[in-house]
């Protein structure tokens, strides 16, 4: 991402070598390229019941820097409603219970997005997604009990890394992602010209 994507307006998609560029007029919003396959996560998912239970400790319930976020926002009824919270293990893992109301590739990516940010420490240090590399192996079915796991990675200055994984009701891996998050002032982060 190069700029916060404006919502509910048409953006332009332009070919760019082996990838595409997403623009809003003259403003570059995002670039997408193919990447090498991601390694399979080595962590073990918690159960759906365990993920649901830790959701009551979701830090975004008391203070959320972006409460209208589609994935994890608390002021968004049409969103995914993810409530990622620490599972209390020695890996720093976070988990979120998720029962999809609709399923698509963009929804799968959205499910893999924010849990990584919360595991990287977004509470008390607002961050936005800088880059995300994701791979979906399969999509869940509407109504299935899924778990999204996330783990913090390295950090340097304002840059924080995370990884996340989406698991189906039997613990099967449905998708994985790696992300870079950038610490920001949330009052200064908004779509250009809006």
Predicted regions mapped to residue ranges:
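A generic structural signal for well-ordered coil/turn residues at beta-strand boundaries
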Residues: 92-94, 130, 175
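A short, polar/proline- and glycine-enriched secondary-structure boundary/capping micro-motif
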Residues: 31-33, 105-108, 186-188
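Non-catalytic linker/capping segments at the edges of enzyme domains
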Residues: 16-103, 194
